[in-house]
Amino acid sequence: MRKIHSVSCCFALLSTIFASAMPLLAQSRSDIVVPGTGVQLNQVGDDFEDETWDFIPNNPKSTEDIDENQRQPMGKSTNGRWYEGAKRGHPDIVKRVPTPPGGIPGSQGSMLMKSLYTGIPNRPSHKMHQDDFICNVQYRLGGTLKVSQSPNVTTRVFIPPLEEWENRNGPHFAFRAAVETTIMENKTKFLFSSKSQKDEVYWPGLFILRGTKQVEGKNVPYAYFRVRADRNGGDFLGPEIPVTGWWTLGLSFTPDGLVHYFARPGVEELRREDYIATSMPYGYRCEELRSFFYNVVN
């Protein structure tokens, strides 16, 4: 089923979001929240164990980022927990499948995401594009989560063997969040200028990439993480992925406005030693968590 080298695909299992039961009144810069800490918010996230789980694509998908065409209505899951990204559209295939070996003990269901035709439907560009699959957080909770509550998210992702990936270097998959801050925007009218506050949304996260390196004189493919983003908005290098199969990924957001990134092989809960990095992407101080989502890149 997965041996199509031009397809980017990944499985997701048990995506969850947590927050502290009460807002934290103070937190030092050195306090890093391990994803999986706090009270699990059962209104959002998914374990994909329901045998009736399904996704209604409502094709053709949105490509607003390319041609400003959303193609309403948006795709959505039948349980109301997931929806198509209005900016870039949903993966070509989103469906419930049997959990691959090595998943959480007792799990019977996972979500498969797979794309071959990213970009504008029926108009191949021969360029790299990405699809979005978004967890319905903000609407199901009735609002955003303030970073005073140290919200954090975890997911289990099955990374297929490298020989099953699309044969190109670069990003193939990502686990990201939509977060919000407040910025000052300069406005000019005639000869006068002014400043006003504006809500700004940005999307930090972990990308999974394919690369090649020299081993005994041969180019050998390998996988690694890149982190979005540093203070200037640039991605920076994360650790290599020494083994494929199941990985647990996590993001946390703390009252000091920082974003923290975690990953470990397997499906066990994240620990402090699984920490990758802390950043203030784009120089923005994070204020609220709106959602988390997956990218499939092709």
Question: Regions from the language model: what does each represent?
Answer:
Residues 244-260, 264-266:
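Localized edge beta-strand/strand-to-loop motifs within extracellular or lumenal beta-rich domains
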Residues 1-4:
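Positively charged n-region of N-terminal signal peptides that target proteins for export
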Residues 9-20:
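Bacterial N-terminal signal peptides
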Residues 271-275:
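A short, polar/proline- and glycine-enriched secondary-structure boundary/capping micro-motif
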